[in-house]
Amino acid sequence: MPVTVRWLGETPYDACFDAMRAFTDARTPDTDDEIWVVEHPPVYTLGQAGNPAHLLVADSGVPLVKVDRGGQITYHGPGQIVAYLLVDLRRRKLMVRTLVTRIEEAVIETLAAYNLASARKAGAPGIYVESGPHRGAKIAALGLKIRNGCSYHGLSVNVKMDLRPFLAINPCGYAGLETIDMASLGATADWHEVAQTLVRRLIAHLDGATAAAALPQQALEQSND
């Protein structure tokens, strides 16, 4: 099934949030699935069941946006890849848990492409460092919303960013959870390279393929809208 990839550059969170909901509400059975790849200015987002107490510093200077995804609080900022998955689960015959697992596998394979071992953790959505001095640190976050059988929101991967804003929150509701980025683990790939790798893996897994069958970049339908 075709997937349109939109490279949105640096875009304010509110604009993407409003656009995702509008896109999902306007979908028809023939609307192509889309992946939006974006980098946000600094912002905290709090899931619909999130506890505001997980924001530990009231005057951080970073705006807080309450959203309708699952999960607790997280941070988005420069140097982080955010990928929004606008997917018709019914058309692809996917259960929500299956979609989450495929997204997690795509992230794990992306990190492995840069010699970073990572894994999922039971009961804690996201991806975590598997070994070394930062074992257990969170390197990618995940949160979805399903409306009328279609997903929006998505995931974030920390590439090379200022990690200090994470110290002002309990990431995803876990007090004391370390958050790390790829650069701190020795990866030298830049944001754009990692984003291209991630998109290939995501599309492969949406189609139920293995990593070896990931689509070449020239096969992606792209738009800079």
UniProtKB/Swiss-Prot annotation:
Residues that coordinate or bind substrate: 69-76, 141-143, 154-156
GO BP of this protein: protein modification process
Active site: 172
Keywords of the record: Acyltransferase, Cytoplasm, Transferase
Keyword Cytoplasm tagged: yes
Pathway: Protein modification; protein lipoylation via endogenous pathway; protein N(6)-(lipoyl)lysine from octanoyl-[acyl-carrier-protein]: step 1/2
Annotated positions for site Lowers pKa of active site Cys: 138
Family: Belongs to the LipB family.
Biological function: Catalyzes the transfer of endogenously produced octanoic acid from octanoyl-acyl-carrier-protein onto the lipoyl domains of lipoate-dependent enzymes. Lipoyl-ACP can also act as a substrate although octanoyl-ACP is likely to be the physiological substrate.
Name the record gives this protein: Octanoyltransferase
Biological classification of the source: Bacteria, Pseudomonadati, Pseudomonadota, Betaproteobacteria, Burkholderiales
